[in-house]
Amino acid sequence: MEDPVQLKEEGNKYFQSNDYGNAIECYSKALKLITDKKMKAVLYRNRSACYLKQENYIQAAADASKAIDVDASDIKALFRRCQALEKLGKLDQAYKDVQRCATLEPKNRTFLEMLHRLGSNIQEKLHVQFSTDSRVQKMFEILLDENSDKEKREKAANNLIVLGREDAGAERIFQNNGVNLLMQLIETKDPELILSAVRTLSGMCTGHRARATAIVHLVGINKICSIMAVDHEEIALAACNLLQNIVDSLTGEDKKVHGKEEALVLDTKKDLKVITTHLLDMLVSKKVSGHGRDQALNLLNKNIPRYDLKNKDNSKTLFVVDVGLKKILKVLGQVPELPNCLPLTPNTRLNASVLINKLYDDLRCDPERDDFRKICEEYITGSFDPKDMEKNLHAIQTVSGILQGPFDLGNILLGMQGVMEMMVALTGSEKEVDQLVAVEALIHASTKLSRASFIITNGVSLLKDIYKKTKNEKIKIRALVGLCKLGSAGGTDYALRQFAEGSTDKLAKQCRKWLCNTSLDIQTRKWAVEGLAYLTLDADVKDEFVEDEQSLKAMFELCKTSDKTILYSVATTLVNCTNSYDVKEVIPEMVQLAKFSKQHVPEQHPKDKKDFVLKRVKKLLQADVISALSCMVKADNSILTDQTKEQIARVFLALCDEPKDRGIIVAQGGGKAMIPLALEGTDVGKTKASHGLAKIAAVSNPDIAFPGERVYEVVRPLVSLLNTERDGVQNFEALLALTNLSGKSDKLRQKIVKEKALPEIENYMFENHEQIRQAATECMCNLAVNKEVKERFTAEGNDRLKLIVLLCGEDEEVKLQRAAAGTLAILTAAEKKLCHKMTEVTSQWLEILQRLCLNEDLQVQHRGVVITYNLISAEKELAKKLVESEMLEILTVIGKQADVPNKQHIINVAREALVKCLDYGFIKTVS
């Protein structure tokens, strides 16, 4: 059994050596073993000191209190508790403790100074508190007085919002009956006052679980949802932020340390479930405005699906699927042109599609997905009614919405009996609303070639009729997009063109015409971009499109409008124009086999060859595509989906392909825009963006390409490209980029080391591929200046130094030899131990060093002579070995050379080495 006294002594030693963690462990073990009260008090006091050093003030105060319970005049424990309480903001209690200390030791200057300081702080706090209380009262008086002038009320409202965002101010408002007064402001029905009240409540809930819980029960979820339901965009958004802050505080997502407050709050799951239920009810209520419905969908999107799929708890999603999936489907099925439609905004149905998609992706197994599908099937089947056309429209609109979300599920639903037939039948209807819904559904349905073939066979003539005859622009543009999508059903395969030669060009021309027509509403022009997203799979169309600068600029301008739902279509169009989509590798033998077995072999369009793609990239850069992409990256996450990010990343990578173009990309902010794409999104998207960053970082000045602190964010994406699963080009360009960055500062070198890049770089130094091996060695050469890297070479039991020495002997690869010799020169200059180690790692070291010193490449020769000088300077015994070999003759020959400008630096180092040998007495001057 361990001795508690010995444990205490060990703890004291750990404390003196600043190892507070182990000290706490020793004191805690001793406390479990000891029964003597006085000894326990000493241990608690000592442990309190450790917690103070670790800035764990709650625990420090608790331990000091336990020591004081044993001995009320324990001056050390009193002072430690005083320090902890001061840090916790409990100045009045801290003052009492230091007052007691000063009574026990009246002449102690530390106690007297602290007593004076705490007294001043308490007075100041009381003054602020009383002035804050009076200010809060004054503000409410002004706001609730109908006779106050407008300017005064606005100022009071803004001050109240600012106070609510500060913890002290929020607490004063709360303690002064502020919640009830804020409710009175809401009841005035004045939009400005409602906005101020909601924003103040939002600030009060931020990062404070107890206050958030109190506000939930004082105001009520029902009331907050009714505020969010009003037809006022700013009020709906403010109420949404209030609910989000409440949810963050209740779940701990605010990332704040709550301390003792944790113990004051009961289980919050019930409150969170009530919030979710109210939000789902809002989706189908006719009393809720379009803005309110959008915010309810946004809150569900943000808080229900898991952020991290490693977390196995998807109970929130399962609850929403069971209780609210049919409600979400009802929103998806709304037809704005029908009289009984729920209030919507242009984004409501898209937000519902995004939510359906996220919920479906969040399901963990096939039974869960089957339940989801069955609910959808039951809902759609229940909506079909031969006697009620409005119900049929609702069913088709629901399928259309699902196709915009989880496409695989939508495709299964399309296979249900009568769904495709109903779509085609509605296309032939005389009612415009029927045509509108049917055409839009056909557009979303024709993504799969099998579905497109059915529509081409059964419905393409109807679409053409609608396009030619209808006078309704909304239907006309949708019919055009439907034809565009059907025309591109063969993808990039030149042999699978669906329409006659030239038909897709005509469709594209009409899309460009509508796109450039600024008199049309944004929604119609958005559909024109959608059409181009399909048609640009045809190389003739993309060539014509990039030549039309007016159309390009019109599309880029649309990206900058408030309606960001266009982003995916724009990104897809640019992916097609730059050919940055995935192309399967063509194996000649497989092509021959396919032809022999009479299988279809995809054909490449002549204009999809490399030189045509490069011309298109040039045109896009001239049209300021980088500014448009940078603007797209800044869009809200609910609109900028991971798939859109991936598309944008593909475009950036294609634009960075030519080294000559990278300067323009950097100048227009492309480097900065790629960083968020490399950190968030799909694995493919992050890899593409990281590769784009590598291309930029390899040839650009990091200070210009990634100004300020951004350069440190680039390191992680670059290191991710060193993974052995990435292809050789990605490995190579990442190494070049890291070489460039590591040459800038030691802080950057430290960041590269911290991101665990060294094992990967060392691995590539063994690579068979010459260029990758060279790039890895060059990177190591730049990193060798770093302290941690030197320590890795100094450590025993590894062959790192041996590898560097052997790479110095690669005479046929001059650049590799140069990098390896540079690394060795840096290491031997920094560590004398490595000079000695170098002579032990391989018996060939002397021969390799001599070859370096005689090398025809002046840079290699310079490095060889520097290494020799380092060895001579390090140790007399090493110098003796070198003098006894042919190295003395080599140094003498170099040192005796006449002064030549291009070789002077080498000659000078050789002479310094000879002087060192002279000092050792190994050689003598000839008089």
Swiss-Prot record:
TPR repeat residue intervals: 4-37, 41-74, 76-108
GO annotation, cellular component aspect: A band; cytoplasm; cytosol; perinuclear region of cytoplasm; Z disc
Keyword Cytoplasm attached: yes
Cell compartments where the protein resides: Cytoplasm, Myofibril, Sarcomere, Z line; Cytoplasm, Myofibril, Sarcomere, A band; Cytoplasm, Perinuclear region; Cytoplasm, Cytosol
ARM repeats: 167-206, 209-248, 746-785
Function: Acts as a co-chaperone for HSP90 and is required for proper folding of the myosin motor domain. Plays a role in sarcomere formation during muscle cell assembly. Is necessary for normal early lens development.
Protein name listed in UniProt: Protein unc-45 homolog B
Organism: Xenopus laevis
